[in-house]
Amino acid sequence: MYASARDWARFGQLLLQDGVWHGEHLLPEGWVRYMATLTPQSVRRDFGAHLWLKVPPPFDSPVKPGPSLPSDAFHVVGHEGQFVSVMPSRALVVVRLGLSRGSHVWDHDAFLARLLEAFPPVKPD
């Protein structure tokens, strides 16, 4: 599916808001939580219902262990390194539309970790 970065960001925002858009439930309540829950059949223990719970190879960090991302992070992964990454605990949606071919040409784990370092959580007043 082809869409603009803005459209993908809206999709990520819809997931971040548990399927609610402008006060209207577009997805059943709890559906996103279900999508972001580990599927028992996931051999590598990293896949939910159409969402990756960890950055999949070859876009994960070649350094082991890789950078630490929030435990509630999940990812929609597209063709050759396109990502919509959602981190509910940080109220953050990140879209990447780059084209990456080959092994470990894009380290999405490290990119997200650097982004989180650059924008620390806001402390409530």
Q: Each PLM stretch: what is its role?
A:
Residues 1-3, 24, 41-43:
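Short, conserved, surface-exposed binding loops centered on an aromatic residue
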Residues 1-20, 82-98:
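Active-site-proximal alpha-helical segments within enzyme catalytic domains
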Residues 4-8, 31, 111:
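Stable alpha-helical elements in mature extracytoplasmic
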Residues 9-16, 32, 36, 52, ...:
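Non-transmembrane alpha-helical segments in soluble domains
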Residues 19-28, 104-105:
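Structural helix-adjacent loops and short alpha-helical linkers that scaffold large soluble proteins
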Residues 37-93:
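Active-site Gly/Thr loop motif
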Residues 73-125:
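Structured C-terminal helix/loop/strand segments within mature extracytoplasmic catalytic/sensor domains
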